[in-house]
From Swiss-Prot:
Recorded catalytic activity of this chain's protein: GTP + 4 H2O = 2,5-diamino-6-hydroxy-4-(5-phosphoribosylamino)-pyrimidine + formate + 2 phosphate + 3 H(+)
Cofactor: Zn(2+)
Gene Ontology terms, MF aspect: GTP binding; GTP cyclohydrolase II activity; zinc ion binding
Gene (name only): ribA
Pathway, per record: Cofactor biosynthesis; riboflavin biosynthesis; 5-amino-6-(D-ribitylamino)uracil from GTP: step 1/4
UniProt-recorded name of the protein: GTP cyclohydrolase-2
Residues binding Zn(2+), per UniProt: C54, C65, C67
């Protein structure tokens, strides 16, 4: 187990009241958060989203990505379901960090795509470690998940880490002229399962 559960408190949101559970990585002290809605106990699969931190999209309303749109849609879907979990995975910029993400944005402004920009900075296309999220699910006593994601890699890694993903639930929102090339690159080069739905 790479994490420990350290704190929890109620978190009222526009979609309802969640329980915010804080975790800490044993090796680094890095914190991560789960938002739990309703009663997630029992054997029924739980609707869940693993959402990687994106300051620009989640908090600063950036149109360069679909992250903020996905965060809101996931919380809404979970509340409508009546039970579920959102894991807020503190690995900014696909785990290259905020400042390197800004550097990657600058390269994208020069014509590189999101994958090429990471490579120019010496990083893989995706540096995230989703095994931490498997530990978070286990600490919440959740073994079966209906995962809100367009990323097959998340399904594969969580499955390998012992989480039973019984269904992948698409979460396709937020496409706009500012992020269309970014989303097309994620589909073409990173295997994300996206279609050409217009902006919502």
């Amino acid at each position: 187990m790479q994490l420990k559960r350290v704190a929890e408190a109620k978190l009222p949101t526009p979609w309802g009241d969640f329980l915010m559970v804080g975790f800490e990585e044993l090796a680094t002290g890095q914190d991560h958060v789960a938002l739990v809605y309703g009663d997630i106990s029992g054997q029924s699969p739980v609707l869940a989203r693993v959402h990687s931190e994106c300051l620009t999209g989640d908090a600063l309303f950036s149109l360069r990505c679909d992250c903020g749109f996905q965060l809101e849609a996931a919380l809404s879907h979970i509340a409508e379901e009546g039970r579920g979990i959102l894991l807020y995975h503190r690995q900014e910029g696909r785990n290259i960090g905020l400042l390197n993400k800004i550097r990657a944005y600058a390269l994208q402004d020069q014509g590189y795509d999101t994958v090429e920009a990471n490579h120019q900075l010496g990083f893989a296309a995706d540096e995230r470690d989703f095994t931490l999220c498997a530990d978070m699910f286990k600490l919440l006593n959740v073994e079966q998940v209906r995962l809100l994601t367009n990323n097959p890699k998340k399904v594969e890694i969580l499955t390998e880490a012992g989480i039973n993903i019984v269904e992948r639930v698409p979460l396709i929102v937020g496409r706009n002229p500012k992020n269309a090339h970014y989303l097309d690159t994620k589909a073409a080069k990173m295997g994300h399962l996206l279609n050409s739905k217009p902006a919502e």
